[in-house]
């Protein structure tokens, strides 16, 4: 079985998951590791990782998923917000819609990534602002 790990990572969280997969799967069976690329399409099984953008995978991964036909696919992703299983399942369901029916989903995993410092600082600044009630 030849596999590929294809991922997009905006803040490094999804790359950490991709690295963990790579470290725990047979190294000699890995035909591709990296950003979306046609070279990954030679693999029978694809581990596809994404960061969440507006409730779905980022655009680069959605475009890549549409190119898959007759593959075994494992989806993994990170979300900077939320930690509930329901929220993660909703994201995964939305992403799965980009997969052609000829593919077989063999599994999925979602987790909350670390929040970037800039986002955290923005939330902290908002918290210090007085709460304005609607008129």
Where are each of the predicted segments found?
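FMN-binding flavodoxin-like domain, especially the glycine-rich phosphate-binding loop
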Residues: 3, 23-29, 43-48, 53-135
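N-terminal beta1-alpha1 ligand-phosphate binding loop
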Residues: 2-24
């Amino acid at each position: 079985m030849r596999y590929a790990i294809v991922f997009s990572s905006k803040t490094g969280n999804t790359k950490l998951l991709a690295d963990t997969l790579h470290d725990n799967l047979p190294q000699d069976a890995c035909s591709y590791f990296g950003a979306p690329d046609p070279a990954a399409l030679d693999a029978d099984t694809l581990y596809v990782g994404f960061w969440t953008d507006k409730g779905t995978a980022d655009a680069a991964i959605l475009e890549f998923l549409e190119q898959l036909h007759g593959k075994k696919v494992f989806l993994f992703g990170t979300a900077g917000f939320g930690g509930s299983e329901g929220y993660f399942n909703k994201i995964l369901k939305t992403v799965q819609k980009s997969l052609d029916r000829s593919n077989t989903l063999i599994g999925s995993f979602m987790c909350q990534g670390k929040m970037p410092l800039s986002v955290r600082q923005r939330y902290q600044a908002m918290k210090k602002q007085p709460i304005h009630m609607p008129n």
